[in-house]
Design a protein with these regions (language model features):
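Right-handed parallel beta-helix
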Residues: 252-263, 275-289, 298-312, 325-341, ...
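Aromatic-anchored glycine-rich loop motif in surface-exposed flexible loops
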Residues: 293, 309-311, 317
């Protein structure tokens, strides 16, 4: 057993384990947190909340009365967190943006309305619907949104503008006289006639709930609405490292136990070509990729762990051979899997489960805006 003493380990490259680091059936190798101590492995050094100051002046007045006394701001360039950027994936089906956490609590990019349910979103009438790839138009009638004026170019629209299963993202221009929004990014499936659900991300005036953040792309300033239990010494982390945090390649009888693995633009733990390798009693959160990816595996998997807050699916598992029907005997069991698919909610699923004779059992799966299990 390799014991890791308590503390926060900030990585600047992938921690790699290979065939040489594995064990045997009689003598497996386990990397484990020291009993009674907390081990955090992260790709983000973090920034202290003391670097922020209360919002003031004109920017304070733009916020709702409840938010005015809570929102804080800092120059993002002074925080040492890395570059904050927004982009759209291929076909504009997925938003690519960083994930933030404050003392381990997930934060959410500000949005309006504040709900995952499309029933609560704004419902807008499309204009000149077009069934092919096009720049959709719709009429915005929400008086609150029409009253917002700050940095409209920062806004990102999310909508099921054609099909109820096909979410898309786009920027747009708003004609304030007519309320017509014209997308400046294409909708792959076009748009359909009728009332369609729309949500707006990264609008400053919508910053109105604890745990939300907004980035002013012109000034480079980051605004946050802290949780009630945070202090000046709280730590803000952002997914900034562009590498998988832990990789296990070609190993056998190697286990990871009792670790908290968090914050990367890539994946948390990646296992490939492994046998009898198990992740147990771990907490994995805040990844723009997946928290866990296990491929070409036998008798390997994840158990008794919590996996949450990923931009896409939380877990990928594949083992066994479809052609020969050779079983993988891999597993995901007794895990809590929640709040995944933060920015991709179509054809992804909370868990991607592949292979032959693998087991998904006794798991609690919730707060996922896509299918729970994709297999």
């Amino acid at each position: 057993t390799v014991y890791l003493r308590g503390g926060t380990y900030v990585l600047n490259k992938t921690f790699e384990l290979t065939e040489a680091d594995g064990g045997t059936e009689d003598l497996p190798v386990t990397w484990r947190a020291y009993p009674g101590e907390t081990v955090i492995i992260t790709g983000s050094a973090g920034a202290s909340l003391s670097a922020f100051e209360p919002v003031s002046g004109e920017m304070k007045e733009k916020l709702s009365p409840d938010a005015q006394e809570h929102v804080m701001v800092a120059d993002a360039r002074d925080l040492g967190l890395g570059e904050i950027s927004f982009s759209l994936s291929a076909l504009n089906l997925c938003l690519e943006a960083p994930l933030f956490s404050l003392d381990g609590q997930h934060m959410r990019l500000t949005r309006y309305p504040n709900s995952n349910s499309t029933e609560d979103w704004m419902h807008v009438e499309t204009v000149n619907p077009n069934s092919s790839t096009s720049y959709p138009e719709f009429k915005l009638t929400d008086e609150r949104v029409l009253g917002w004026s700050y940095q409209e170019s920062d806004w990102l629209y999310s909508s099921y503008i054609r099909y109820g299963w096909a979410q898309g993202y786009f920027h747009g221009t708003l004609n304030r006289e007519t309320g017509i929004v014209t997308a400046t990014d294409t909708a792959y499936y076009g748009s359909a006639a009728g009332q369609k659900p729309v949500q707006i991300y990264n609008a400053y005036e919508s910053l109105d709930e604890p745990g939300e953040w907004y980035y002013d792309q012109m000034s480079g300033r980051l605004y946050i609405y802290p949780f009630a239990d945070t202090t000046r010494n709280s730590t803000l982390r952002m997914t900034s490292s562009n590498f998988d945090l832990i990789s296990v390649n070609g190993a056998s009888y190697l286990n990871l136990e009792g670790l908290t693995v968090t914050s990367s633009k890539k994946d948390g733990i990646v296992m490939n070509n492994v046998d009898h390798c198990v992740i147990e009693n771990c907490t994995l959160t805040s990844f723009e990729g997946r928290a866990v990816s296990i491929d070409n595996a036998t008798y390997s998997g994840l158990k008794n762990s919590e996996v949450a807050y990923t931009s896409i699916s939380a877990i990928y598992l594949n083992g066994g051979d479809y052609q020969t029907m050779e079983p993988g005997y891999d597993f995901i069991t007794n895990c809590r899997i929640h709040d995944t698919n933060q920015y991709r909610t179509m054809n992804e699923g909370g868990v991607k489960f592949r292979g032959v004779k693998n087991t998904f059992s006794n798991n609690e799966v919730y707060n996922i805006t896509d299918m729970a299990l994709n297999f």
